[in-house]
């Protein structure tokens, strides 16, 4: 494992920034990656194609769910095992993660291609959107194995402490995507199919980059299949610990599909407006998530090493960081909402609606970090069941019923307001969990 001092003895704030900054850059790159498709498709001036990108969006959540379930679970276990001095277990985790990611990617790819028509109908396509959504999905499905591999391998590389190398892979993948997006979409006139092709190509390059690092420079990490055969039953532990991340991503996709099904009843412009508002605020939630996920190895290592004092300080500093960041970026997004929405939508009616909906989404920015942090803490200490329940709250148990209730009460505005109510409710419960752990760590530290 690289940089052991970073995990064990370094300044807490220095350790946080050393792990969080590369993770943030990776997430920003992913956001840029995600926004590039909608931005260049938006340049076509076709609201139906913009809406098609939004309708297929939940498929990205399905792929991300598989990747994060494997990658986050493996990352937490690898860091915790290293803290306890169990290096060989890390190799087993790495091997299991890589090969399971590959085979699941192939299965998901086949499933998406075979079931694309009923899937798109379920996701909320109407007659105007469907032809574009089908083209986008077909190309995306072919690249599913590379999407899953690139995302899970990025987490493995960070778990070894090589956050910079993980960042480089994401940068290269996004650079490829941003170069080929305008070429495929605008120059060659492939439209949404070109956006999907550029995304697949970018993920392929990122996968190759991570594979090269692991093969040539990995210490705990390996892609050799033999370690996986030594203890295949360990896959259950990895999946259990990574399940909260997977559930969160999957539920985000389900919530998005339910939202689109409700929005499409208000017209294609409503789907496009909510998609633009979501892209505008996605940067905030993704960066906060990156801070928490990037620092998860620090939490897991401190817990595995029995260092209660350091774990307590990590939690306090991360709470402060995520709340302050949420306040500042939420205010900035509110102030610049017209320019941000205008990046994705040119049609006047959809633009005006998008600027209204984004207000609801930014109001929850100060507290969303509490939910991410509490989930990552529970994963780091091996409390998988608690993390699963917490993941179910924000995107599932709270948001999905609220979408239908608020749509019935307030229409399109209510759909956006449902996200705010769910964010605040989940954050309140998460705050209670974090306070419980802080008190327990204070008592444990006092006993030492």
Stretches with model-predicted labels:
Residues 18-37, 139, 150, 173, ...:
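Transmembrane helical elements of multi-pass membrane transporters/channels
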Residues 71, 140-158, 166-174, 195-208, ...:
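Short runs within selected transmembrane alpha-helices of multi-pass transporters and secretion channels
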Residues 50-110, 147-166, 260, 273-331, ...:
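Small-residue-rich hydrophobic transmembrane alpha-helices
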Residues 41-61, 127-132, 192-193, 234-241, ...:
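Interfacial/gating helices of multi-pass transporter permease domains
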Residues 28, 32-50, 120-127, 183-190, ...:
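Helix-terminus/linker motif at the lipid-water interface of multi-pass membrane proteins
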Residues 8-39, 43-44, 58-73, 77, ...:
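N-terminal transmembrane alpha-helices
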Residues 1-20, 78-145, 187-243, 299-364, ...:
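Short alpha-helical transmembrane segments in multi-pass integral membrane proteins
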Residues 62-65, 177-182, 207-211, 283-286, ...:
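Hydrophobic transmembrane alpha-helices of multi-pass small-molecule transporters
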């Amino acid at each position: 494992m690289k940089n052991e001092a970073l995990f064990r003895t370094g300044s807490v704030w220095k350790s946080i920034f050393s792990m969080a900054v590369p993770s943030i850059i990776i997430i920003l790159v992913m956001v840029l990656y995600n926004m590039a498709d909608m931005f260049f498709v938006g340049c076509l001036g076709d609201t139906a194609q913009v809406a098609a990108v939004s309708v297929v969006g939940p498929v990205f959540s399905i792929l991300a769910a598989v990747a994060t379930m494997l990658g986050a679970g493996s990352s937490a276990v690898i860091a915790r095992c290293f803290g306890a001095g169990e290096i060989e277990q890390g190799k087993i985790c790495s091997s299991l993660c890589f090969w399971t990611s590959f085979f699941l990617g192939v299965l998901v790819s086949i499933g998406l291609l075979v079931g694309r028509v009923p899937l798109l109908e379920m996701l909320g396509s109407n007659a105007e959107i469907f032809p574009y959504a089908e083209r986008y999905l077909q190309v995306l499905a072919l690249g599913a194995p590379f999407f899953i591999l690139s995302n899970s391998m990025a987490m493995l590389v960070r778990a070894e402490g090589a956050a910079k190398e993980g960042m480089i892979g994401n940068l290269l993948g996004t650079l490829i995507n941003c170069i080929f997006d305008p070429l495929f979409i605008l120059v060659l006139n492939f439209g949404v199919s070109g956006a999907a092709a550029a995304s697949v190509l970018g993920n392929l390059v990122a996968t190759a980059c991570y594979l090269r690092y692991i093969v040539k420079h990995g210490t705990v990490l390996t892609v050799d299949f033999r370690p996986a055969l030594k203890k295949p039953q360990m896959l259950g532990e990895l999946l259990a610990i990574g399940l909260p991340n997977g559930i969160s991503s999957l539920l985000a996709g389900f919530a998005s599909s339910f939202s689109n099904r409700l929005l499409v009843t208000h017209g294609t412009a409503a789907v496009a407006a909510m998609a633009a508002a979501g892209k505008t605020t996605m940067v905030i939630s993704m960066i906060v998530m990156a801070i928490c996920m990037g620092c998860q190895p620090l939490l897991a290592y401190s817990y595995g090493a029995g260092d209660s004092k350091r774990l307590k300080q990590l939690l306090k500093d991360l709470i402060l960081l995520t709340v302050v960041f949420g306040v500042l970026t939420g205010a900035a997004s509110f102030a610049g909402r017209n320019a941000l929405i205008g990046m994705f939508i040119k049609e006047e009616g959809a633009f005006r609606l998008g600027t209204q909906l984004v207000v609801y989404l930014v109001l929850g920015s100060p507290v969303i970090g509490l939910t991410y942090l509490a989930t990552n803490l529970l994963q780091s200490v091996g409390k998988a069941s608690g993390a699963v329940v917490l993941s179910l709250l924000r995107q599932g148990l709270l948001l999905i019923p609220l979408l239908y209730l608020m749509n019935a009460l307030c229409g399109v505005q209510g759909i956006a307001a449902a996200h705010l109510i769910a964010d605040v409710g989940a954050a309140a419960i998460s705050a209670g969990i974090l306070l419980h752990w802080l008190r327990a760590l204070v008592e444990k530290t006092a006993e030492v």
